[in-house]
Amino acid sequence: MINIRKTHPLMKIVNNAFIDLPAPSNISSWWNFGSLLGICLVLQILTGLFLAMHYTPDTMTAFSSVTHICRDVNYGWIIRYMHANGASMFFICLFMHVGRGLYYGSYAFLETWNIGVILLFATMATAFMGYVLPWGQMSFWGATVITNLLSAIPYIGTNLVEWIWGGFSVDKATLTRFFAFHFIXPFIIAALAMVHLLFLHETGSNNPTGIPSDXDKIPFHPYYTIKDXLGAXLLILXLMLLVLFTPDLLGDPDNYTPANPLNTPPHIKPEWYFLFAYAILRSIPNKLGGVLALILSILILVLMPLLHTSKQRSMMFRPISQCMFWILVADLLTLTWIGGQPVEHPYIIIGQLASIMYFLIILXMMPVASIIENNLLKW
């Protein structure tokens, strides 16, 4: 009798995706981040669900309800900090996952890559709205500053901002709708992740060499199920180290002050995972220009397949491109640092140079490096 997992309509889908899936024999730990992102998403949905049971999306009580969760709800503090630091782990995994895709040329799978970019945007939007919910000082002013950027759009900008706010400032209506959107968005992200996987399984995984691996495939289970489980154990370890020892390490102290529209904090800044984009936004003196640069800093990922000039897919055998890639990583770390600094000398000029470098490396230096490498192959 044939195995039930190969015949049952539902189990067949799971079987083809996680058990009998043919996988390359040489994919490294950089290929673990996809499953880790799935774990992060499930964890965020579960902790978020339990937080939503005790949270009240109202300007009068939001801050108090979060305090109530931490003080009075059984294990509320651990749920709250797992959710807050879970977002940080989520973005660490996201950046690693995207970095892996850039390094090994995974962007050649166009549909998978483009849905991945949409997923990145959706996750960033969701995280932003989540940061507003505790209704601390940084929540309120972060929401005010970032939503206000839309007013830079010519003609319809001001109307658009007031429409999003549901009034003439960030207020009760804004908080309520942000809570609604923050609740629904992870389920949309989960659905998109399914489509992401669907397209990936049409082609099969890439591998570090960038060479087709049809000749040497192994079953996903047990080889990569055990590897994923190890990655998951390390992810949970790192998350719980953060949660149990330094839960506020990545947060902003200003968010422990209730939101006050009459008092602006001296340095408005987003969570650490948005700082690189925030630095690019601030480095351009023009409002609309800054907003465009902010959007393009992420949207530029869509252009990666067009900017690929190399004869090889992966960077594994391309030392000049490797150099460019790691300079780009260093540049992003520099931008992250600058994003958290006040707008004063020398941070302004460093931010501007790092922003120029970011676009220059991606649009010019990496494609040129690839062409040089192609020519070196002829020697």
Swiss-Prot record:
Entry GO terms, CC: mitochondrial inner membrane; respiratory chain complex III
InterPro entries for the chain: Cyt_b/b6_C (IPR005798), Cyt_b/b6_C_sf (IPR036150), Cyt_b/b6_N (IPR005797), Cytb/b6-like_sf (IPR027387), Cytochrome_b (IPR030689), Cytochrome_b_C_euk/bac (IPR048260), Cytochrome_b_N_euk/bac (IPR048259), Di-haem_cyt_TM (IPR016174)
Residues that, per the record, bind heme b b566: H97, H196
Cofactors: heme b
GO terms assigned for molecular function: metal ion binding; ubiquinol-cytochrome-c reductase activity
PROSITE patterns: CYTB_CTER, CYTB_NTER
Positions bound to a ubiquinone: H201
Pfam families xref list: Cytochrom_B_C, Cytochrome_B
List of residues binding heme b b562: H83, H182
GO BP terms, alphabetized: mitochondrial electron transport, ubiquinol to cytochrome c
Keyword rRNA-binding appears in the UniProt entry: no
PANTHER family: CYTOCHROME B (PTHR19271:SF16)
Function: Component of the ubiquinol-cytochrome c reductase complex (complex III or cytochrome b-c1 complex) that is part of the mitochondrial respiratory chain. The b-c1 complex mediates electron transfer from ubiquinol to cytochrome c. Contributes to the generation of a proton gradient across the mitochondrial membrane that is then used for ATP synthesis.
Subunit structure of this chain's protein: The cytochrome bc1 complex contains 11 subunits: 3 respiratory subunits (MT-CYB, CYC1 and UQCRFS1), 2 core proteins (UQCRC1 and UQCRC2) and 6 low-molecular weight proteins (UQCRH/QCR6, UQCRB/QCR7, UQCRQ/QCR8, UQCR10/QCR9, UQCR11/QCR10 and a cleavage product of UQCRFS1). This cytochrome bc1 complex then forms a dimer.
Protein name: Cytochrome b
